[in-house]
Amino acid sequence: MAPADAPANIQAAVAAGNAIHTFPYVWGGGHRSFTDTGYDCSGAVSYVLHAAGLLASPMPSGPMASSWGAPGMGRWITVYANASHAYMIVAGLRFDTSSGGDRWNQGSGPRWRKKKRQMGGFTAKYAPGY
C-alpha cells in the first residue's frame, strides 16, 4: 500500500505492482505488451512505470540504465538498472524479480521485497518530480 501522502500516480504504481506481484518470471515477459501472463525484470519495471504514467512503451534493462529518466535517486521512484537486470524502489519498497539475497522472500517473478540489495553495478535513475 502506498503512503497516504503519495501522489496519485505513485499510488497507481503500487497498485500495478500489487496486480502482478505473484506472476511468474518469464524471459521477455511484458515486452510485447504491458499486459502479459509473466514478466521478466525490465518487463515488470516497465509495467509499473507505465501505470504511473512514466513510460510509454516497454523498455529492456540496458536502455533503462542509459536512456530512461535522470541520473540519481527519486523521492518516490528509483529504477536501478544495468545491461542485464532492472529493479525499482517505489515508496520505499523494492520491486524485483530476483530475491537479491533475501532468503526470507524467495520466488522468481515480480515481488515486493523487504530487504535491500547491493546496488553496485547498477545505475540509479528517476523521473524528475518523482
Model regions and ranges:
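A general structural-boundary detector
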Residues: 4, 31-32, 74
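Soluble non-cytosolic domains of exported or imported proteins
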Residues: 4-11, 35-40
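A structural motif
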Residues: 10-22
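...with weaker cross-activation on analogous glycine-rich loops/strands in unrelated enzymes
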Residues: 14, 46, 50-130
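Active-site nucleophile-His-acid catalytic modules used for acyl/amide transfer and hydrolysis
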Residues: 19-38
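Surface-exposed loop/turn and secondary-structure junction residues enriched for glycine/proline
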Residues: 28-30, 42, 57
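Active-site nucleophilic cysteine motif
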Residues: 33-52
